């Protein structure tokens, strides 16, 4: 005879608050989860406020420019890609060169790409 959901609900309904607390802790340990409440996202604020809070940025290669070989070298150094993969990335511009990086690192990458003759931007 299998235990049904109704049987479980009846058993839980008869527990005290302390027993329920122990039950929740047992579930957390058994299944490796947390019963903490999930924070619900509030309404969207002003765009400027959201931009200030952004901590991860994507560096986008907009155009390779005239010095394609130099840009490929910089892309290889930044990403660790092989020659063919870096060439494909540069040829396929606009493409993301690096994703989820800190602002300072993103600015440094854009500077390197720009010095090599490419057009790059931070998003």
Swiss-Prot record:
It comes from the Bacteria. The keyword Metal-binding does not apply. Gene3D superfamilies: 3.30.1390.10, Single helix bin (1.20.5.710). GO terms for biological process: translation. One of its GO terms (cellular component) is cytosolic large ribosomal subunit. One of its GO terms (molecular function) is structural constituent of ribosome. Forms part of the ribosomal stalk which helps the ribosome interact with GTP-bound translation factors. Is thus essential for accurate translation. PANTHER family: 39S RIBOSOMAL PROTEIN L12, LARGE RIBOSOMAL SUBUNIT PROTEIN BL12M. Belongs to the bacterial ribosomal protein bL12 family. This is Large ribosomal subunit protein bL12. The lineage of its organism: Bacteria, Pseudomonadati, Pseudomonadota, Betaproteobacteria, Neisseriales. The gene is rplL.
């Amino acid at each position: 005879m299998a235990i049904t959901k109704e049987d479980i609900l009846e058993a839980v309904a008869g527990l005290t608050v302390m027993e329920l607390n122990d039950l929740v802790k047992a579930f957390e340990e058994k299944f490796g989860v947390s019963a903490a409440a999930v924070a619900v996202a509030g309404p969207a604020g002003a765009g400027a406020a959201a931009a200030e809070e952004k901590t991860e940025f994507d560096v986008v290669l907009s155009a390779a420019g005239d010095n394609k070989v130099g840009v490929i070298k910089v892309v290889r150094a930044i990403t660790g890609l092989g020659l063919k993969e870096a060439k494909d990335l540069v040829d396929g511009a606009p493409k993301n060169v690096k994703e989820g990086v800190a602002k300072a690192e993103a600015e440094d990458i854009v500077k390197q790409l720009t010095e090599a003759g490419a057009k790059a931007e931070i998003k």
